């Protein structure tokens, strides 16, 4: 069988079906893709995931704001003042202890609670913010046929998908090979990204 490109949702489904060689699992491949995406979004923190959002402008007296869609982890957060005001992360417990009152001012710290960012103190004014954060890769689907992860690292996708099929592949010797290949690809990508940041 000839090797095929893996650059779209459809091509990934076909490649996974070819590798699995189990026609009874073909309908489940989109589920395996979703599970693989959840797995690598948890494991990786690379530049392809970095996104800047300036969507939050504070409202006087409002201390909690929704995190952006796809938010995974904060990298840097500041008020776009002149000079900028960097916001330091503190734990939710510290936030409750230090900023429980109704006082307002220029925010100095933030914490994350569920899907919200909470500022301390509560803003006294409207401030534009800038948030550099890690965003989950856009999930593949019939309408979102590719993303940066599939374009740059099709091996992570393929081995991740094959690995998620494991519960259906009892005693299949290939599973251990796929697990090793997946872990190695994740490590390689993270290591390369770390090197690129320091060169």
Where are these regions (language model features)?
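Glycine-enriched, solvent-exposed interface loops adjoining structured elements
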Residues: 2-199
